Amino acid sequence: MLAGRPGTRSAVGELGTESSDNLDRAPLGPRESGGHHRPGSYLDMKIHLEKNLEEERQILLQQQKICRNRARKYFVESNRRKKAFEEKRKEQEEKEHQIREQILQQRKQKFEEVTEKFQRAHVPLSQRRKAVSRKPVPPLEEALKQIQESNLKSEVNLPFSRRPTINWRAIDSALPSALSKNDHKHQKQLLSKINCEKEMNENMRATLATSKNVFQLKLEETQKLLEDQHLSNLQKFCDEVNQITNSETLSSIDSLEATEHEEIYLTLNKEHSTSIQRNTISLKPANMQSTNLSCFDEDKLAFSKTQHINNWLTNLDASNTQNVTAFSDILSKSNVLPSWEYFNSKEQNPSPLNGTVERATNTANNSVPFVSSPPMFVLDKKCEKTSETSTMRTTDSTSGAFKRERPLVTESPTFKFSKSQSTSDSLTQEVATFPDQEKYSELNQENGTTSIPTSCVPVATPLVLPSNIQSARPSAKNSIHIKEIDAVQCSDKLDELKDGKEEEIKYFNCNKEELPLFSDSFQDAYIPHNPDSKDEKQKLAETSSLSNVTSNYDFVGQHKKMKYNIHERNGVRFLKSILKKESKYEHGYLKALIINQSFKFGNQKAAAIRDSIELTKEKGAEIPKTIKKLRWFDETSNIENNAENSHSLKNKTGTTQQHSQQFHIQSGAGSNIISVSTCAVNSADTKKSREDSISENVTTLGGSGADHMPLNCFIPSGYNFAKHAWPASKKEESKIPVHDDSKTKQGKPQRGRAKIIRKPGSAKVQSGFICTNRKGAVIQPQSASKVNIFTQAQGKLIIPCPPPQSTSNIRSGKNIQVSQCQPVTPENPQNIITHNSFNSKHVLPTEHSLNQWNQESSSPLSNACSDLVTVIPSLPSYCSSECQTFAKINHSNGTQAVARQDATLYCTQRSPVCEESYPSVTLRTAEEESVPLWKRGPNVLHQNKRATGSTVMRRKRIAETKRRNILEQKRQNPGSVGQKYSEQINNFGQSVLLSSSEPKQTTRGTSYIEEVSDSTSEFLMAENLVKASVPEDEILTVLNSKQIQKSNLPLNKTQQFNICTLSAEEQKILESLNDLSERLHYIQESICKNPSIKNTLQIIPLLEKREDRTSSCRDKR
């Protein structure tokens, strides 16, 4: 069997030989030793051993084959695992690399966005490039995976039970058998497919999770955005409501949108007036009804939402407001007399006013309300004009009440509005609103007249009456008890308008009464009358042709309580300051709209609207810049808000007649205007004697508007009045009753009360004015028939003497017109009265008619003009010792106001007068104050008669010097502002002529004037020029020319005085001053030639002048 194999044969042979040798040897030994030999047993053993060896060899070979197969399997498995591990590592590295790239890309994109935002921060949002969020483009492998995922979406969308389940354990257990049976390539493909499926499933799950998360995030973001938008809308709505209820001016909600304020409760039609006449137009009710909607044709006016808001606030409590009367019903009544007030301004005014006020009166005892519906009508210039207005006025002999009814289309707030009237050919129109009703009720109850309380409750009064030249002139007729009526005043500083602490003092302010506030110049003149006797009433009855309708009013205390309760009940929140101050306004009184001076009505768009009462929003180039407030060192703590600045428009002058204007005093900074009414008090003699003299000349002279005014102010527009440095004491303020009955006034003369004394004279001669203050009375008679005219101030009595005037020498020269003013700065701002003209705390601008001093010259009234010097009471004792002099000059209008330490305030203004009208002023000592006024008058008259001869020669000398100075100044620089200013200074210095018996007062007065005009006036002139938007170069040239011109002043002033009366020391001082002035003139010329040293040397002349003055004062002492 094994013979065929060589290996076996050799093995067996070797084994057989070996065994045979061994066998042979083994038995040979015994055989040799004598044993027996057996050959058969030897062969059998040999065969048996070979068989066993062959079996063992086969087993070993089989085991070797199995081990080789196992090693091969393990090797393959190890190689597969290595490859799988390598692939996984590569995939992880790729994933990490992709993640890194993605993060870096995001960071790079964010960095680019931030840099772009930073670089384009100056570019507006509309022009910026919007960053578009673009999805990153996936690489090719990810795109293939996404395609495979999209193919397997059907499998993913199947339910979980129907999905093909893969038993991974069975696959792993079957792997060894499969590997042993199948080829290596088949195994590799199977494993790759399984891994691919695993990854795809994992990716699908991840994408589902991420898509769910993204969807949830987007949903949450949209919800948050919607919530934020809703909240923002709610917040905006709440802010608008709060702005409506809490705004300082209820009708200025769209204050930044100036175009929406063309109509605010009064339609105003701009018409250029080429004539001076202000005529009263009387229309029939049919004509009124035919034009009642004409206002809506102007600029397509529509009632703004401010009107609806105010109407809503007005109608919060319908039970406390009067029933709405249909406008047609009111017009259809027989007792309604509609009259139209036609307001035209002069040609210089760009915004004339056409206001329509309908008046309804009843002759019976029933109180028919006056219906005022300005928004409904526009008066056309072509309407009928009447020359007589006395025939159109009806009176209510017993009682009447004015109220403002709601118009036809929209309901405007109720408002106590007085009738406004104008006389034919009158140059000033008047609109008045009634002040506090309680004082009327007190007056009515004292006089026993019937009073009817009204339940009209004005919640807000956005009535706006911007007027150009208007004033209120209520007058008396028959036995009607006339009450004191103040005009509507304009004030932006309403925190000053506080009620007085005493019940007697009823201030007319916006806290107590809802009033239209006028920011334009609004001319006021009042003739309040309180007749006491039958004779006075009879004389008043004689002048009934000029009297106007006046009704009695009784608004008792329940009116104020009712307003307060309505506001508290309806939850109206009251005004607070935008400047985060404490609210100084009482509850229950809302304020009206403040309209800036540049607010234009009618066909013009609104140029600017005052956004707030305390915070002014300037819009447009025509609005003046913020006026800097001068703070004097002797101001008390609460007097910062009283820097007066008068703004009034220039009136057209007729052939010979001067027309009055309102004197405005500006309070605080930011063009805050407090229009100050002229002063008048209940006096029976005033109306009686006044109307006796002018009742026949109203229509012929065309000056009825001015005839009724006891006090007129010739103060031009832009006239700046310096701030008073002397405050009134609190005790005096608290003791001054504003309105009092004439009977109680006789028994209890009040300090600080203003009285009017009028004497019968010609129609153009104004009556005298007495204002009693702390230490005496300021008496300014304005009668041509009286020469004993004197003005008393603290320590001085200034008497203007009549100049000799000739009608042939009249030219358009310059005249100085002076207004009397009293200190307006009390210590307590709550006691400031801006709407009361019956108090010494109030500025009382009085117009002095310049045709008074005619007795010597006996020239016609039209040509008779003179100069007056007004003296203002001196400072109180606690601040008069260290008060600095000050002045505020407005050069653009040719006016000047100079206040001195010796308590004399000179307000000068130029107007066409006679060339030779140069009055002389005689100063009286303070000892004459102890003499009673009725004794002092004749004495002054007698002294004036004695001093007449000596003043004539002096006047001639001064006239010659003044002419020479004016001619020299005109030759040098006739058109410059500085020239006009120096001319004013020269004329002003020459106008103050002093008697030869008081040489010390002469030199002292002129030195003070010169002091004021040097330092402070330069600063004020520069400030005015800056405010007028003059370039810096022109300002510097004006200042230099003014300083050069002022060098001539000492020479001019030394010529004015009688040198013989001066002592030798004074003559030396004057000579030294002349030398110094020449040196200063040389320095000024050098500075003008070398502008580089202008800034360093410009202060030197002022310092040198001050040093010279101080040295001269020391030498005098």
From Swiss-Prot:
The keyword Cytoplasm applies. It is found in: Midbody; Cytoplasm, Cytoskeleton, Microtubule organizing center, Centrosome; Cytoplasm, Cytoskeleton, Cilium basal body. Residues 745-758 have a biased composition (Basic residues). GO terms for biological process: cilium assembly; cytoplasmic microtubule organization; mitotic spindle organization; non-motile cilium assembly. InterPro entries: CEP126. GO terms for cellular component: centrosome; ciliary base; cytoplasm; midbody. Pfam families: K1377. This is Centrosomal protein of 126 kDa. It comes from Homo sapiens (Human). The lineage of its organism: Eukaryota, Metazoa, Chordata, Craniata, Vertebrata. The gene is CEP126.
